[in-house]
Amino acid sequence: MQRLPVLVLVVICLVASADSTADARVNYLLHCGGCHLPDGSGVPPEVPSLLGDPGKIIALPQGRDYLMRVPGVSQALLDNADLAEVINYMMTEFNGDSLPRDFK
């Protein structure tokens, strides 16, 4: 009987985590996908692709500072937590191989 509360807690955590990822994807599509496209490919050279190396850029303080100044980011109606979730979504969805090992 003690397993039931643990199982319920695990299910609740999984659902909450899934909602967070879904929200980040929706926010990406609403605030970034119009220019960078749903698959992150962008429209080079005007709109850079998010595929490939941006994970290396986000690892640098200057890269994160630049990312915060992109018009869709700096003018988005997202709070800091939602914005961080969108950036994390973009990095893991489009750049998993280029991310630093300690990326969370």
Model-derived regions, located:
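N-terminal secretory signal peptides that target proteins for export/translocation
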Residues: M1-Q2
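Bacterial N-terminal signal peptides
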Residues: P5-V15
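Short coil/turn linker and secondary-structure boundary residues
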Residues: A16-D19, I58, L78, R101-K104
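Sequence/structural segment immediately N-terminal to covalent heme-attachment motifs in c-type
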Residues: D19-S41, A59
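Structured segments of extracytoplasmic/periplasmic soluble domains
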Residues: H31-G34, P38, D53, Y66-V73, ...
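Gly/Gly-Pro-rich "capping" loops immediately C-terminal to redox-active cysteine motifs
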Residues: S41-A76
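An amphipathic alpha-helix signature
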Residues: L60, R64, M68, N80-M91
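Flexible coil segments in periplasmic/lumen-exposed cytochrome c-class electron-transfer proteins
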Residues: A81, T92-K104
